[in-house]
Amino acid sequence: MIYTKNTKQMTDQQIIDALISRDEWVTYQFFFKTCRPLFVSVMRYVFSYKVDYDEFVNEFYLHLMENDAIRLRQFQGRSTIYQWMKVVAIRYFIAKRDNMIDMEPKVALTECAERGDSFDEVQKTTARMDVERLFSLMPNKRYVYVIRRLVLEEAEPNKVAEELGTNVDNLYNIKKRAISALTEIALNEVEKYEKRRRK
């Protein structure tokens, strides 16, 4: 099979097929170039300390390739390969982190309990990463600040208004415009995804 010189120009299924067949060039480009920002973000959200990227991604790759790449063969194209890979990576790294905690006797049991159910954490981590990505697409960083403080951090409106040098009434107007802008960006992203799927 002949590939382009950029995995971004390949279809999702072409990438999966190339990974399953252990194509060295595609494997390197995908895990160490194209998906590097994605995996770095996942590791930053999952681990509270710095980890070795190459080491952890190599282990993740071996995990995917176990039993004749059975996990890669589960990709069905219902989402993009990057969205799918993000969820798989989050699950893997949360399990790895929790396993490392289990091996550390000095960690208090309450700390382990506070981490909650892994499935819930996968969903929360995925949602946080999706929101941060949408924030990065918003040109008006004041809107991002207002949504982050009022919605995500649930800060008091009076305090946020003071931080922005405005009043509460104006702050609510800013919040309304900010959520409208965020919704428009999210809908545009969904539309782009649907167009890619139809190709």
Regions found by a protein language model. Name each.
Residues 86-106:
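Arg/Lys-rich amphipathic alpha helix in sigma70-family domain 2
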Residues 12, 32-33, 40, 50-70:
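Conserved RNAP core-binding helix
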Residues 157-193:
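DNA-recognition helix of helix-turn-helix
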Residues 17-42, 51:
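A short, charge-rich alpha-helical start-of-domain segment used by transcription regulators
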Residues 51, 55, 69-87:
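Short, aromatic/basic-enriched loop-to-helix "N-cap" motif that marks the start
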